Amino acid sequence: MYKVILHKNAAKYYRNADKKLQGRINTAIDIILENPRYHVHIKKLEGELKDMVRYRLGNLRILYEIHENVKTVRIKAIEARGSVYK
């Protein structure tokens, strides 16, 4: 299983989210940690973000990088769909 590292921006979004949303994010992170590459809500990004993967959580997107050599998932952003890719 992978370990998770939250980037400061992702951690800030998580801290400011209400408890219900935090629970949904926790569930999504558990799914990501089980298998960070394959799930119905997981997609590898293209273009400038080609090293990133996204998890779709309703209107939110969780963007992360996978580091296979140390079995780590680094979550870079948790934001609304419209602003996360900017």
Name every feature range the model reports, one short phrase each:
Residues 1-8, 16-23, 39, 57-60, ...:
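Enriched for short, Lys/Arg-rich terminal
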Residues 30-54:
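A short, surface-exposed loop/turn module that caps and links secondary-structure elements
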